[in-house]
């Protein structure tokens, strides 16, 4: 069992003292009763607690961080938020107020979330997810003019200012998928590939499509069609039967760039279609199709780490003025049935 993270607050609770007293005990120049100091240091040593270099942050004003997630697909947004919450708990030594707002894309599109966004106008920093649609540009521009400390998760807008983005590289993901499909089909005379992407107004999906087209050219794959449709509802999944009817058994490989791929997997499985399928992300409903062989491989972008990186780097910027890289990438990995267990708990 993992040991509970020990923080200044843990030590304070065990000894019945204030967190600020615990913080002062580690400063030899701070005014504190020597018996109290000795007790605090002995307790800290007992639990192998070493104060963070930024523990002096306890005596300063509270940092306020807002999170606004406009979600289309719950398994994606949940993992991002989990990563943010875990990072928040690990940085419990600092005075941080974390407020999270979740908005369903079915109820409100990102460009309609100006009121929710403006609640955070006076916060020290803001983390956004789901605002990769070009339609969001106007409200993002207006907001960043008033609060420049904006961090994007999973996407990086092209035409508005932001502090940094925490994301995967869609170029690498597309190249990896194309190379995998090539290796599956390299001994076949026919190498017909279908590409399915999500919202065509999304910078992320557009980048992924362009990179995949180029990778197909490099690896000698025949991209017979690229379909871009809104993946927030059933628009993409409703087209699946007609796509397969159109190509009538001529599809050898498929890459889908959205995590909302269960309908595609169901169709392929139920109709026993022999095709090499590369999907995106892992979640309970998709894992079933990885295990039964419908999905040949899936791209893992580590959404939880994207959320964690966003929060940690933002806090370090606000406290220490550490300037982060403009884009912080998680590793892109390929998951198959044989290693799926390493990524699911």
Outline where the language-model segments fall.
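Hinge/cleft segment of the Venus flytrap/periplasmic-binding protein
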Residues: 200, 214-216, 302-345
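Hydrophobic alpha-helical
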Residues: 125-144, 224-287
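Flexible loop/hinge segments that line or gate small-molecule binding clefts
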Residues: 133-172, 283-295
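Hinge/beta->alpha junction and helix N-cap segments in small-molecule ligand-binding domains
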Residues: 70-79, 100-111, 166-175, 195-214, ...
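Amphipathic helical "hinge" segments at domain boundaries
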Residues: 50-114
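Hydrophobic alpha-helical segments within soluble ligand-binding/sensing domains
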Residues: 164-192, 284-286, 301-319
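N-terminal helix-turn-helix DNA-binding module of bacterial transcription factors
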Residues: 1-61
């Amino acid at each position: 069992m993992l040991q509970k993270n020990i923080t200044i607050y843990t030590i304070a609770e065990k000894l019945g003292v204030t967190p600020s007293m615990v913080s002062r005990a580690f400063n030899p120049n701070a005014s504190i009763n020597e018996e109290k100091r000795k007790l605090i240091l002995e307790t800290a040593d007992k639990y192998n607690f070493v104060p963070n270099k930024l523990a002096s942050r306890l005596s300063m004003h509270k940092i306020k961080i807002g999170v606004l997630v406009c979600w289309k697909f719950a398994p994606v947004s949940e993992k991002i938020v989990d990563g943010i919450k875990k990072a928040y708990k690990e940085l419990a030594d600092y005075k941080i107020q974390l407020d999270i707002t979740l908005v369903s894309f079915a109820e409100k599109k990102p460009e309609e979330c100006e009121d929710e966004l403006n609640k955070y106008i006076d916060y020290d920093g803001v983390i956004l997810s789901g605002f990769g649609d070009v339609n969001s540009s106007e409200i993002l521009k207006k907001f960043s003019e008033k609060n420049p400390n904006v961090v994007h998760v999973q996407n990086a807008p092209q035409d508005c200012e932001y502090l940094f983005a925490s994301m995967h590289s869609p170029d690498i993901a597309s190249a990896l998928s194309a190379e995998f499909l090539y290796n599956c089909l390299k001994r076949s005379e026919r190498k017909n590939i279908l590409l399915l992407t999500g919202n065509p107004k999304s910078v992320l999906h557009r980048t992924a499509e362009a990179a995949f087209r180029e990778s197909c050219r490099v690896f000698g794959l025949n991209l017979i069609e690229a379909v871009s449709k809104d993946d927030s509802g059933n628009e993409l999944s409703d087209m699946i039967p007609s796509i397969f009817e159109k190509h009538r058994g001529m599809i050898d490989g498929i890459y889908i760039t959205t995590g909302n791929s269960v309908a595609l997997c169901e169709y392929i499985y139920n109709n026993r279609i022999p095709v090499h399928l590369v999907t995106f992300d892992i979640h309970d409903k998709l894992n079933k199709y990885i295990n039964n062989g419908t999905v040949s491989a899936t791209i893992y972008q580590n959404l939880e780490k994207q959320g964690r990186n966003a929060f940690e780097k933002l806090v370090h910027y606000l406290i220490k003025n550490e300037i982060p890289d403009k884009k912080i990438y998680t590793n892109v990995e390929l998951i198959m049935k044989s290693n799926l267990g390493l990524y699911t708990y």
